Amino acid sequence: MNCKILFRKELNDSECELSLLLVGDSDMKEINRLRRGKDKTTDVLSFPLEFDFSPLQKILPKNTSSDQKMFPPVALGEIVISIDTLQKQAKEIGHSEKDEFYRLLVHGFLHLLGYDHERGDKEEHIMKLKEDECLEILQGL
């Protein structure tokens, strides 16, 4: 079992890819300033390539065994993680850097899929449940 199973509905069984950029706090601060107008560092940023707010399953091609090789992977976007902040947060929370990396990666991935904790309490709750579900699987790896 892996995270792909958790997101089967969202990904419509399609092959997808994303870019992952690991940076220091100074670069993260600059990216955050340029892309979001916030002059501070942060732990993770996500930049989806699909700006249509339709559900992803309407956009992604259905992947069946016969046409698995027919479609190239769908590029979901980019996740940027600050290694400096990751290390600080792991120490503050009291878990490993690997666990913090997984937490930030899952958080960023959920944003690429359209989940957004900043849209209100209900959305935050839904995103937190998905995050916890995926992290439980990843911790077994």
From Swiss-Prot:
This is Endoribonuclease YbeY. Zn(2+) binds at residues 107, 111, 117. InterPro entries: MetalPrtase_cat_dom_sf_prd (IPR023091), YbeY (IPR002036), YbeY_CS (IPR020549). It is an enzyme of class 3 (hydrolase). The lineage of its organism: Bacteria, Pseudomonadati, Spirochaetota, Spirochaetia, Leptospirales. PROSITE patterns: UPF0054 (PS01306). It is found in: Cytoplasm. GO terms for biological process: rRNA processing. PANTHER family: ENDORIBONUCLEASE YBEY, CHLOROPLASTIC. Its EC number is 3.1.-.-. The keyword S-adenosyl-L-methionine does not apply. One of its GO terms (cellular component) is cytoplasm. Binds 1 zinc ion. Keywords: Cytoplasm, Endonuclease, Hydrolase, Metal-binding, Nuclease, Ribosome biogenesis, rRNA processing, Zinc. GO terms for molecular function: metalloendopeptidase activity; RNA endonuclease activity; zinc ion binding. It comes from Leptospira interrogans serogroup Icterohaemorrhagiae serovar copenhageni (strain Fiocruz L1-130). Single strand-specific metallo-endoribonuclease involved in late-stage 70S ribosome quality control and in maturation of the 3' terminus of the 16S rRNA. Pfam families: YbeY. Belongs to the endoribonuclease YbeY family. Its cofactor is Zn(2+).
